[in-house]
UniProtKB/Swiss-Prot annotation:
Organism lineage string: Bacteria, Pseudomonadati, Pseudomonadota, Gammaproteobacteria, Enterobacterales
GO BP annotation list: glycogen biosynthetic process; glycogen catabolic process; maltose catabolic process
Enzyme Commission numbers on file: 2.4.1.25
Organism this protein belongs to: Escherichia coli (strain K12)
Protein name per the record: 4-alpha-glucanotransferase
Pfam families tied to this protein: Glyco_hydro_77, MalQ_N
Class of the enzyme per the UniProt entry, highest EC level: transferase
Family the UniProt entry places it in: Belongs to the disproportionating enzyme family.
SUPFAM superfamilies: (Trans)glycosidases (SSF51445)
Entries under InterPro entries matching the protein: Glyco_hydro_77, Glycoside_hydrolase_SF, MalQ_N
Domain of life of the native organism: Bacteria
Length: 694
């Protein structure tokens, strides 16, 4: 009886009773996992909401019938107020359904039900069927752009890390060569007080920006500050700066120390202002409200905590009195350190303003997409977002991936999941706010691990990933809200749908107008016959690789496998041998396809095992995806420069310097290089030809 009750409770909470393992067989979830995941959820909080005649939120598709079932008995009067203030009225009997007016506009409306002195409210969300698509894509153009890890950019002026100044310059260079966008890694807020926690996919908050990307050279108060300029002229400053700039790997600690020193001095001058700039800053702070304030408070408090003890990596390691955002001690800290909090507010304003200026540049060059941002799948356990909202995040669990052949224990990403019951109890407000924050100043948003809108692999805290289970999310409602916000922001959506993709979400994503992600390396069958360029789906973005995969040279030379062996990533020699054999077959299949579809000169070799990477082969591989039917093409500067080293190796942390490897050339020299310019001209021409072949 007890086990039946547990199974029912787990099912009701959205916990799947089993999953399909790497061998294609159903595997049951243990009672202990169900128990611990139920314990991790805040279901009791979510269900505390009083039972009402209507749910707290309903989501509908525009133009379709909108039935509303009213629970209870007796007569109710209803009043529907649209976002614009238009009102509709009527009466309904409890236990029956009625249809909301079909002419309801898209948006967020409020339904109020009244009976005697009792009132119930329902948020009514009316959404379009599909996400926004730019006119260029509706006109069947084939667009291309650069996919960039911003921190990897080198330039003659930056401070040892790619910044918003570099992004601005690169947008101009890409636009002039026919490119339509620059795609970015997540630029979410990280940890100024813990700069070595550098993964863009383990952010402190997804609502705010990473202040390391501020271009200090573009900050007026840095140039106006005598103190800052005296510091700038010091030989030690210039020497440290040059070392950071020349390094092949981003030195986050040095770069952060340099930027924070300069910006602290600049802030002293800005804080004295009483002008339009100060008014704009204050207005930004007022408009962004509590969420921004607590981000700044977190960063200020974190900086103080790390000064006292550098092991205080995040709020779970702080003294208990500072672990709760509502504690009197936190309030007192904010009052006593008002200038510090204001400094971090200012940094967010600077980052926002500089990123907005990049967007303006892209629009000035009439780039159809301009910038595309990346939304990480979650936030880190000890960051600002979990500190501010303990109820929304389930800290007794983390997300990851189930076991597979390469990783028999699965993957644990160390990110606490959002509680689907709390998201619904709050009428989807956390999801809406997240989209709004990330759809600003861009023409596209890439959603990392888009399957998370349907389900996430939850792992009880402290366990390995093989002890996890899938937890379901309200996918239809979330996709509808995604379409509404996408349309409002004129921001198209790309869903990263690699790995295990459940059949039920594929159709939903396509019909919602979410663009798929097609990686050249994976577009083949069991015989290693590669998908023809013309067979790529139009509603997709084609790329050769991603930040988690080897570059073209790395792939062809099996550098990723060699490195994986050195780092001990594979369970045994048998697995590794199988991977090498698989790669050789894939390379031959790829080479055959390059010849078959005219991407290589006829004189080029036909036997992959005898061919090394050459400029001709590199160009041929990029031509293959340039010829594809995909509406979008993402190219990596690493491949323009024929680089071999990866920027990230999944499954490693301390074993490899992830998120640090820079490009091998500065932006200035890359765009002055004849080889790069000829390559981009060739690929741009082929994209235009691919559009005409339709």
């Amino acid at each position: 009886m007890e086990s039946k009750r547990l199974d029912n409770a787990a099912l009701a909470a959205g916990i799947s009773p089993n999953y399909i393992n790497a061998h294609g067989k159903p595997q049951s979830i243990s009672a202990e996992t169900k128990r611990r995941l139920l314990d991790a959820m805040h279901q009791r909080t979510a269900t505390k909401v009083a039972v009402t005649p209507v749910p707290n939120v309903m989501v509908y598709t525009s133009g379709k019938k909108m039935p509303m079932v009213v629970e209870g008995s007796g007569e109710y009067s209803w009043l529907l107020t649209t976002e614009e203030g238009t009102q509709y009225k009527g009466h309904v009997t409890g236990g029956k359904a009625f249809n909301l007016p079909t002419k309801l506009p898209e948006g967020y409306h409020t339904l109020t039900l009244t009976q005697d002195d009792q009132r119930a409210h329902c948020r009514v969300i009316v959404a379009p069927k599909r996400c926004y698509e730019p006119q260029a894509l509706l006109n069947k153009q084939k667009l291309w752009g650069a996919c960039v890890q911003l921190y990897t950019l080198r330039s003659e002026k930056n401070w040892g890390i790619g910044d918003f100044g570099d992004l601005k310059a690169m947008l101009v260079d890409v636009a002039k060569r026919g490119g339509s966008f620059i795609g970015l890694n997540p630029i979410h807020a990280l940890y100024p007080a813990n700069p070595e926690s550098a993964s863009p996919y383990s952010p402190s908050s997804r609502r705010w920006l990473n202040v390391i990307y501020i271009d200090v050279n573009a900050v007026e108060d840095f140039h106006l500050s005598e103190e800052a300029q005296a510091w700038w002229q010091l030989p030690t400053t210039q020497q440290t700066l040059q070392q950071a700039r020349d390094a092949d790997w981003v030195d986050y600690s040095t770069v952060t120390a340099l930027k924070m020193t300069a910006l602290r001095m600049a802030w002293k001058g800005f804080a004295q202002r009483d002008d339009e700039q100060m008014a704009a800053f204050r207005q930004f702070v007022a408009e962004q409200g509590d969420s921004l304030f607590w981000q700044a408070a977190f960063d200020a408090l974190h900086a103080q905590q790390v000064k006292e003890d550098e092991m205080r990596w995040g709020w779970p390691a702080w003294p208990e009195m500072y672990q709760n955002v509502d504690s009197p001690e936190v309030r007192q800290f904010c009052e006593e350190h008002r200038d510090d909090v204001d400094f971090y507010l200012w940094l967010q304003w600077l980052a926002y303003s500089q990123f907005a200026a990049c967007w303006e540049i892209s629009q000035g060059y009439e780039m159809p997409i301009g910038l595309y941002r990346d939304l990480a799948v979650g936030v880190a356990e000890g960051g600002a977002e979990t500190w501010c909202d303990r109820e929304l995040y389930c800290l007794k669990a983390s997300v990851g991936a189930p076991p597979d052949i390469l990783g028999p224990l699965g993957q644990n990403w160390g990110l606490p999941p959002m509680d689907p019951h709390i998201i619904t109890a709050r009428a989807y407000e956390p999801f809406i706010e997240l989209l709004r924050a990330n759809m600003q100043n861009c023409g596209a948003l890439r959603i990392d691990h888009v399957m998370s809108m349907l389900r996430l692999w939850w792992i009880p805290y402290g366990e390995t990933a093989d002890q996890g289970a899938y937890v379901h999310y309200p996918v239809d409602d979330l996709l509808s809200i995604l379409a509404l916000e996408s349309k409002r922001h004129r921001c198209m959506v790309i869903g990263e749908d690699l790995g295990t993709v459940p059949v039920e979400i594929v159709g939903k994503l396509r019909s919602s107008g979410v663009y798929s992600y097609k990686v050249l390396y994976f577009e083949n069958d069991h015989e290693k016959t590669f998908r023809a360029p013309k067979a790529y789906p139009e509603q997709s973005m084609a790329v050769a690789a991603t930040h988690d995969l080897p570059t073209l040279r790395g792939y062809w030379e099996c550098g990723d496998l060699t490195l994986g062996k050195t780092l001990g990533l594979y369970p045994d020699e048998v697995v590794l041998r199988g991977l090498y054999q698989d790669r050789e077959l894939a390379k031959q299949g790829l080479l055959d396809a390059l010849h078959k579809y005219g991407c290589l000169p006829k004189r080029a070799g036909h036997k992959a095992s005898l061919m090394s990477m050459t400029p001709t082969l590199n160009r041929g591989l990029q031509r293959y995806i340039a010829d594809s039917n995909s509406a979008l093409l993402g190219l990596q500067p690493e491949d323009w420069l024929d680089m071999a080293e990866p920027v990230n190796i999944p499954g490693t942390s301390y074993q490899y310097k992830n998120w640090r490897r820079k490009l091998s050339a500065t932006l200035e020299s890359m765009f002055a290089d004849d080889g790069v310019n000829k390559l981009l001209k060739d690929l741009d021409r082929r994209r235009r030809a691919a559009a005409k072949k339709k």
